[in-house]
Amino acid sequence: MKPPGPMMNELLAIGHPEVMAERRRWLASLAEERRLSEKTVDAYERDTRQFLTFLTGHLAGPPRLSDICALRPADLRGFLAQRRKGGAGARTLGRGLAGLRSFLRYLERNGLANAAGAGAVRSPKQPKSLPKALTDREALKVVTADAQLAEEPWIAARNAAVLTLLYGCGLRIAEALDLTPADFSGPVTSLRVTGKGGKTRIVPMIAAAAEAVETYRKLCPYHIEPEEPIFRGARGAKLQPAIIQREMQKLRAALGLPDSATPHALRHSFATHLLAGGGDLRTIQELLGHASLSTTQVYTGVDSARLLEIYDRAHPRA
């Protein structure tokens, strides 16, 4: 069954028209101004929809802006408690609270609410989970061009280029698919990347990544303007993450890789293998585009046996 679209989501959400109108504007701003990924925006849409439904039951009627303005920390804790009772884990609850804080801050900036109540609620403590990195041998299998399963050469080259950017440069999948010809216009050994929140960083581009992208661009049948995304779907539209995720599923089956071998696992592998090769955390933080060093520090806990296996080698694709 297909997930509900935006119109159905509006019908499912319960709130006064003035609240729903502001919510639509806020969601649009997340994608257009803050450049959050489609996945994050969809998650925030679900979280706020569930919160409005909770408030409707809590207030015995669809909430108005005045009700949102009068929210207390206890109201938010009650919502989180209900979600926890329904089986939501700490990560889901933390993301939900982050979405509500974002919505309330948006309303506060527009003089429509007070976000202090959300700020007074602590985020659930997140369990430490270690990245599931591929071995260097597994990662190389994935990014090798002749391992791609697509019948058309340009699509096989496209898939190989995207996956090589994830592993060879540590990009998020959304960052790779947003790349334009202009992002490659600097030195041949560097790449301009626009990450979360619209923040730009310059990352080194190893030869294998540069060659993979160049091969794709030579084979791609579509004309691409300097400010347009370079990676295209079969019909010429911007390539969507789901296509690369499906390609990775096929590669997993063909190469006998574990279920943990996902596009994002290639980014984890980039960081893990660099750390094992002697890279320092601060540099890896900058390469990954992490706002906080604490986010990067999770790589120090990666299985020591895996690190020892590749200890004396630098990045395998360098």
Swiss-Prot record:
Question: What cellular component terms from Gene Ontology apply here?
Answer: cytoplasm
GO MF annotation list: DNA binding; tyrosine-based site-specific recombinase activity
Key words of the record:
Cell cycle, Cell division, Chromosome partition, Cytoplasm, DNA integration, DNA recombination, DNA-binding
Question: What Gene Ontology terms for biological process does this UniProt record contain?
Answer: cell division; chromosome segregation; DNA transposition
Where does the secretion signal sit in this chain?
none
Where found, per UniProt? Cytoplasm
The annotated active site, in chain numbering, is 172, 196, 264, 267, 290, 299 (o-(3'-phospho-dna)-tyrosine intermediate)
Tell me which residues make up the Tyr recombinase domain.
129-312
Entry-linked PANTHER family: PHAGE INTEGRASE-RELATED, TYROSINE RECOMBINASE XERD
Q: How does it assemble?
A: Forms a cyclic heterotetrameric complex composed of two molecules of XerC and two molecules of XerD.
**Family according to the record:** Belongs to the 'phage' integrase family. XerC subfamily.
The protein in question is named: Tyrosine recombinase XerC
Biological source species:
Rhizobium meliloti (strain 1021)
Q: Which gene encodes it?
A: xerC
